[in-house]
Structures are given as C-alpha cells and as structure tokens.
Regions:
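Short acidic-rich active-site patches of cyclic nucleotide enzymes
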Residues: 71
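Short Pro-Cys-Gly-centered "Cys-loop" motif that presents a nucleophilic cysteine in a tight turn
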Residues: 1-64, 68, 77-201
C-alpha cells in the first residue's frame, strides 16, 4: 500500500521550499482565521525585539518589513540556515508572548507561512514597494511614511530602526538614492505588481 494513503485518505506531501545560502524571500504570515496578532503598541514593539533576536541568531538580513494588524510581510535574506528555522523561532517566540499576555489558547498564526523566492532585481524592488504600500492599500494612512510599523521610515532616513538593511535596496538608485527610492515607492502612477496570490505556500 502506498505510504501516502492512510485510512483511505490520500496524504498530500507539502512541496519543499527552494532554498540556498543567501536566498531572498518575500514572506507573509497571517493570524489564524485572519484574527489580530497585534492589539496594541506594545505588541508591535515586542515583535520587533523578537525579530531582532531571530535576525541575529540566524544571521539573516531584513530588507523590508511591515506589520499589519493580522499579518506580517518580510523581505528577508538568509545566511547559512534554511528559512524555516528562522520563521519557527520568530513565530513561536511571539506566539508565546501573545498567548501569555491575552490568555489566548490555540495557534496564533496560520500553520504555514507563505513565501516567494526573489531572484530578479526588478522583483526585489517591486516587493519592497509592495510591502511598504500595504498600509496605504488598506487605507490606514495616505502616505507610507506615516505608518509607524514598517521599515519605510528607516528606508527614507526619517529614523533608524537598527534592523533594516538599506544598502542593497538603495544601491539600485544612483544619485540621491533615498529620494529616488521614495519617488519609486510613492509614484502615484504605479500599479501593485506583486499580488498576494503570487506568494506561494
């Protein structure tokens, strides 16, 4: 009997994620049943601290991030460890904090995060823009710089979150790279090229 058939049901194996040292991913992790994973300002701050710990532990680089009320987006560059180890550390540590604070039982996040391997330079830039425009698309703010819980303010030098790696992104733009990147993101004529359905499970 086929090992994938158990009790008359077919067990479908999950496709392994493509990975290699230095691989860059667009990652999206959502709260289970689209429930809130951030309820107040402290939650966002704690998540950022846990993100810092995970980045340091697995020597990853974050090129862009955005924390929405019920999901997160990351543009992440790996090092010598497969992406799953980083995501496990990040999600489990935050879930422990959240469940303890709110006396919540059960899973906080959907069982499997979504990911898309970013290989082309153009897709890297589109993904960075897409992530930073999430709060605008959701009509939370008019301008991406007005949203506190993303890396955009750091990218355009309004603050330094000591997390975001700006150099790779800004290197695509020559003179006045910060201004040119800002124009690239906030260009009202652009379209949201990167769509959520393109982020594979």
């Amino acid at each position: 009997m086929n090992d994938n058939i158990i009790k008359g049901e077919r067990k479908i194996a999950r496709k392994l994620r493509e990975w290699y040292p230095g691989a860059i991913y667009h990652l999206m992790h959502r709260g289970v049943r689209r429930t809130e994973i951030f309820s107040d300002e402290t939650d966002y701050q704690v998540f950022l601290e846990i993100l810092k710990v995970a980045l340091d532990k697995y020597q990853c680089k974050i090129h862009a991030y955005c924390m929405m009320t019920n999901h997160i987006h990351l543009l992440l560059e790996t090092s010598e460890d497969e992406i799953g180890r980083f995501m496990k550390c990040l999600s489990e540590r935050y879930a422990m904090y959240f469940n303890h604070k709110y006396q919540y039982r059960g899973h906080l996040f959907e069982s499997r995060y979504k990911s898309c391997l970013v290989k082309e330079d153009s897709y890297f830039l589109q993904t960075s823009r897409y992530i930073h425009l999430n709060p605008v698309k959701a009509r939370i703010v008019v301008k991406p710089e007005d949203y506190r819980w993303s890396s955009y303010q750091t990218m355009i030098a309004l603050k330094d979150d000591r997390i975001t790696e700006r150099n790779r992104t800004l290197a695509y733009f020559k003179d006045n790279s910060i201004l040119r990147y800002r124009d690239f993101v906030e260009d009202i004529g652009h379209k949201y090229v990167v769509q959520e359905h393109e982020i594979k499970k």
